[in-house]
């Protein structure tokens, strides 16, 4: 049987591994290295270079050497992160035909999936050279906070590279697999993964072959690239102060500075001081200029201290979501090249109150975990159960713009959840299902993943139709949503496509905004719930007044009409006040009591008590929002 390989497709470096008997083994590339730079370059004559050869010529060919492209994968061109990256990289980021962020080399545009595919091809060739056979299947890792668009784009990259991607697995989870495969006793561990482009923290319970993720969190704007750029900015500032020359717009100089910054950062993990020496960095009328500077570990730590501190909040959030304290964590596993930095290790020790575990290679452990998962799928690794989670809540927009969650964040996947909704208007023949992801109370504040229509509902009173909405998330974290009218059996479904995915900026913004706006969100939700209750009361009161108004006095009819009008005004305000709506709702209920009594007496007179009224079929169903979709609009959104 052909081998299934495990690939860690990293922002800065990539790594490939395979099961060799009962153990996972990292495969060395053609250059003899165990990791490969995630870089692709195009020479003037069109030659394509991948990995170390691309890195070697980056200084002389900065505009056509592409790196850290993983930051762009699955992102729209207008994404705030893309805007930030445009000013940090020497190559050009352009808008693709589909509106995604693409990169340009030698005047030709490439999608990030294409560039990633070139790196995956290098990994595939490395494995084929070692195994002596063709490789067609792989397990590929992604950051835990990657969204649907990014996961789908990663699968596309695998397909372009000639690989069938059997599974997309989260990087911290893969690391936990490699760490805990031979651990029999139960443990609660934290995987602290600070890599080249992203930061993830996952809390897991492991033991006797079971790996259960309890929670995950992260910061998708944080990684080694940010540390490098902080040092580059410092070097640019120092050089400008000493020489009066700004190197910001000199792409050749910036590429040299970036390489020097990365080298100095690595050296300072094992020494207290290093020297950055870049001769002929630029020139002016007086002649060539050289950059020579001594950099201490203390200075580097002061430059990047806020970046390191930014890892603390996600860690605390993950602990809270998992329902454990730092003291209850048995082991903290460090993953990612940046976790070698002494300052990072010091912060981790302070946060968790224990020395972090350094028994795994932070550059290789993720690929090893991917290989183990490949072995599980292939049947070579027995008695291993992996339970991962979805990082953000998923739900739909319901009446009043409320975000109704169907699947809460940190729910174990794969998972399937259904809930029954109904219509908001009489004789409503179509509903629009808007699928959103996030942590805010109002749908508009979360990210719209996609929408679709369920049409052909038979005319009936509001609240009567039973519409079952089902969310289905597979083991790759890819979402599918369906809606079915229980009465007619009509059904529609949507698979969230890459163009509708979330950006990293959106995900981080959702969680942080949710915390910052918790009070505001609560007030707005209360107002919407009060308005929904008010509209229901108005509807029933108007109907009762029309049918039985002649049973009460003119004064009572006027009082009820005035109370209905006042409640309508309060509930239709542009900034509805929950307390005002509740007060006017109470007033309407009180003035309607005589009408209710008259209705009861009329029914008694007609034939006695009707007995226990049958429960209204719309009870316990959440009202779904309604929007008429014209054919032209439907075509545009398709």
UniProtKB/Swiss-Prot annotation:
Residues 514-542, 605-638 are annotated as: Disordered. The keyword Metal-binding does not apply. Keywords: ATP-binding, Chaperone, Nucleotide-binding, Phosphoprotein, Stress response. One of its GO terms (molecular function) is ATP binding. The modification Phosphothreonine is found at residue 198. The keyword Chaperone applies. Residues 514-529 have a biased composition (Basic and acidic residues). InterPro entries: ATPase_NBD, Chaperone_DnaK, Heat_shock_70_CS, HSP70_C_sf, HSP70_peptide-bd_sf, Hsp_70_fam. Residues 605-619 have a biased composition (Low complexity). Induction: By stress conditions e.g. heat shock. Belongs to the heat shock protein 70 family. Acts as a chaperone. This is Chaperone protein DnaK. It comes from Rhizobium johnstonii (strain DSM 114642 / LMG 32736 / 3841).
